[in-house]
Amino acid sequence: MPREIKDIKDFLLKARRKDAKSVKIKKNQQNVKFKVRCSRFLYTLVITDKEKAEKLKQSLPPGLQVKEVK
């Protein structure tokens, strides 16, 4: 089931959880979507600022599988 997250800090907490499996990064012209797959929900964060998206990509946990989808 999908859930949308509005806060970057909340998204990072979800990404650091034990049951977080992977992150998909979808880029388009207007925004960047980060989707983290946990055991129950697929959490989505939408960012319109490209610089913030790059910083968030750098701050993802190192053990997490990251896929970039164009």
From Swiss-Prot:
GO terms for molecular function: structural constituent of ribosome. GO terms for cellular component: cytosolic large ribosomal subunit. One of its GO terms (biological process) is translation. The keyword Metal-binding does not apply. Keywords: Ribonucleoprotein, Ribosomal protein. Pfam families: Ribosomal_L38e. It comes from the Eukaryota. The keyword Ribosomal protein applies. Belongs to the eukaryotic ribosomal protein eL38 family. This is Large ribosomal subunit protein eL38. It comes from Spodoptera frugiperda. The lineage of its organism: Eukaryota, Metazoa, Ecdysozoa, Arthropoda, Hexapoda.
